Amino acid sequence: MAREYKIEDYRNFGIMAHIDAGKTTMTERILFYTGKNHKIGETHDGASTMDWMEQEQERGITITSAATTTFWEGRDGRKRRFNIIDTPGHVDFTIEVERSLRVLDGAIALLDANAGVEPQTETVWRQAEKYRVPRMVFVNKMDKIGADFYRSVEMVGSRLGAKALVLQLPIGAENDFEGVVDLIEMQALRWDGSIGASATVGEIPSGLKEKAEEYREKLVEMAVEVDEAATEAYLEGVMPTNEQLVALIRKGTVEVQFHPVLCGTAFKNKGVQPLLDAVVSYLPSPVDVPAISGVDVKTEGETTRESSDDAPLSMLAFKIMNDPFVGSLTFCRIYSGKVQKGISLENTVKRKKERLGRMLQMHSNSREDIEEAFAGDIVALAGLKETTTGDTLCDPLKPVILERMEFPEPVIEIAIEPKTKADQEKMGIALNRLAAEDPSFRVKSDEESGQTIIAGMGELHLDIIVDRMRREFKVEANVGQPQVAYRESITKIAEIDYTHKKQSGGAGQFARVKIIFEPHDGDDFIFESKIVGGAVPKEYIPGVQKGIESVMGSGPLAGFPMLGVKATLVDGGYHDVDSSVLAFEIAARAAFRDGAKKAGAQLLEPIMKVEVVTPEDYVGDVIGDLNSRRGQISGTEARGIATVVNAMVPLANMFGYVNSLRSMSQGRAQYTMQFDHYEPVPSAVALEIQKKYA
C-alpha cells in the first residue's frame, strides 16, 4: 500500500491549555468541521468524543491524551492529514502533557479570553519551550462576560515571556462578538447560524479600521525580521505580498521566534476554520522540524533519523492505554521508515524483540485496523509485551535509542489495601497495568508494614488511579491518609575509612575503602574515584558505587531516599585472594551508613508552588490560612476583578486544602499547586516525623 498523503501534508499537533479553557470543545469542533464527527459533543453534558474515559466525562476534565487522525482541505484545495493529540489541562496530569509534547511537531495554546494566561498555561508553555515546540495561540471564549482579547495578548508577553504576533482582531466581545478581522487579507469574517459552517467575508467595520492598520503594521514589522532580504526590502519601502507574508510568518513560527495569535469562540462555532487554515499555513510538517536525535546502539555515537520513509524504521512509544476490546495499546510516533503489520521490532531500551500484532489508527474512541504506516504517522500497536512509555522501537538491523523522556518524581503517597481476599490478586495486576501506563505513578511495598504504597503527582492523580481500579479492573480498595514523600540529605563533609573483613573458614572477604561524603547542589547522586596507584583495583570500583547506590534509598533519620550526595573514593586496600566486587560493595554500604550519620543528615520536605485566585473579599483569609500552613507568601497581583496570591507551602500542610478554600471563599476561589523544590524540615517538625517513622 503506497502512502496516501505526502509527509509535507502532515500536521502532528496538540491543543494545550489550562483546565476549563475550552480545549475539549475546541477539539470537538475541529473533528466536526473536518468531517469526523456527525454531531458536536458538548463537554457540558458529558458527551465529548475525545474525553473517552468514563471519569473524564464525569469530571469534565481531560485526563489521557487521545490521538485522533482527521483531514482538512486548506485554502489551496490540497487535503492535509491532521494527527491531533488531546492533552490534559489539570496540573496533576502534567506528565501526560509532557509525553504528548514530546511527539508533537506543533501546538495550539488555548487561552480563556476572560482569564488570559492562567497558571497551568504557564506550566505547559514551559514544557513546550523545553522541547522547542512551535506554538500558535488561540484566544477562546470571546463570547464570555469579561472577555478581553488585548489583555490576553499582553499576558502572552508579560506572563509567558513570548512574542505574540497578532493575526486577527475581534469584532465585538462578550454577547456582541460577531467575528474577526483577518490582518493578512485585511477583511472581516463574520459567522452566522448555529454551527458556523461558513463565514461571510466583508469590509472591516469603520470603528476598527485604524486599529487594524496599526496591528497590520506591527505584524509586517515583526514578520520581516525573520529574513534579512525581507528586512532590507521593507526598509527600502517595499512591502511583502500576502503570499510572502504567510511564508515569513511560517518561518518565524517554525523557528519559534514568535507565536501567531488568533481568536474566536469554539463553543459558539466562530473562528474555528481560520484556525485550521492557520495550522496548515504556520505549523510545521514532520520535515520542517529538526531530525530527531538518538544514540546508535552499535557505535554508541550520536545519530539522527530523518523524517523519511526510506530511512531505517524508528518510533517512540509515548503512551500505553488499556482498551477493553483490544487489551493493551501502545501509542507510537513513527519518526522514520515504515512499519508493516506482523514484522519483528527491537525495543532497544529493554533489549528485547517485539512482534507486531494489530496496528490501529485511532479516532478518539473508535479504531480502524491498518496494514502499514509511514514516517510522521501516530499509530496504536496491540500485542506488545515488553514496551513501556519512552521506549524506542526500531529496525533490529539498524538499532537506535531515541531521546528518553524525563519524568518527575512523585510527591505524594498513600497506603492502599484490597477490601476482600478476592481483590488481593486483582489489585496487584491492576496496579502494575496502571503503572505501565503512567510513569509518574509508582507502586511499592513497605518492607516493614507489608502495606502496598502508591505514589503520584497529587491527590487528584491518586483519586483517579483508585477510581480506575474500581471501574476498569473491578477492584475495591481501602485507601489510607495521604503521606508526604520526604527525602534526606547531608549538610557537611565526612571522611570514612572502613574495612570489611570476614575470615570464617573457606574463602574470606576483604575490602578497605576510604570515602569522602559531601553535599552537592543537585538532587542526584555523584560518584567519583580518585584512586591512584591501584589501591583499589579498577574492576572493584563499580562495586563501591553499586554498594552506595543500593543503600541511598534509605537514609539514617527516617529511612527516606537520600538526595544531593557526592561520594569520592580516595583510598582503599585489597587482598589478592579474599577481595571481590561483593566485598567492596559491602564495605561501601557500611561506609555510607557511617558517613550519612557523621555528615549531619537532615530531613527534606517537598515545597509546593501554590497559586490561589480569589475574589478580593477573601484575600485576607486566604493569606492568613496559607501562613498558618507554614506558607511563605511571595506576592499578590490583580487579575481582572480577582486577586492572585502566590505562595510556597510545604506539601505536608496542603492536604484537604481544596475543602477549606471552598468554605473560606464560599466556593469562589480556585487554586493550583505543583512541586517546586525540596527544603530542610524545621527541627521541631523533623523530630515528630522521625518519631513517626522510627
Swiss-Prot record:
Every tr-type G domain range: 8-287
InterPro entries, A to Z: EFG_II (IPR041095), EFG_III (IPR009022), EFG_III/V (IPR035647), EFG_IV (IPR047872), EFG_V (IPR035649), EFG_V-like (IPR000640), EFTu-like_2 (IPR004161), G_TR_CS (IPR031157)
GO terms for biological process, alphabetical: ribosome disassembly
Keyword Nucleotide-binding attributed: yes
Transmembrane segments: none
GO MF annotation, one: translation elongation factor activity
Matches recorded under SMART domains: EFG_C (SM00838), EFG_IV (SM00889)
GO cellular component, one term: cytoplasm
Alphabetical keyword list: Cytoplasm, Elongation factor, GTP-binding, Nucleotide-binding, Protein biosynthesis
CDD domains in the cross-refs: EF-G, EFG_III, EFG_mtEFG1_IV, EFG_mtEFG_C, EFG_mtEFG_II
Entry binding sites for GTP: 17-24, 86-90, 140-143
Role this protein plays: Catalyzes the GTP-dependent ribosomal translocation step during translation elongation. During this step, the ribosome changes from the pre-translocational (PRE) to the post-translocational (POST) state as the newly formed A-site-bound peptidyl-tRNA and P-site-bound deacylated tRNA move to the P and E sites, respectively. Catalyzes the coordinated movement of the two tRNA molecules, the mRNA and conformational changes in the ribosome.
Family: Belongs to the TRAFAC class translation factor GTPase superfamily. Classic translation factor GTPase family. EF-G/EF-2 subfamily.
Name this polypeptide is given: Elongation factor G
Originating organism: Bartonella henselae (strain ATCC 49882 / DSM 28221 / CCUG 30454 / Houston 1) (Rochalimaea henselae)
Organism phylogeny: Bacteria, Pseudomonadati, Pseudomonadota, Alphaproteobacteria, Hyphomicrobiales
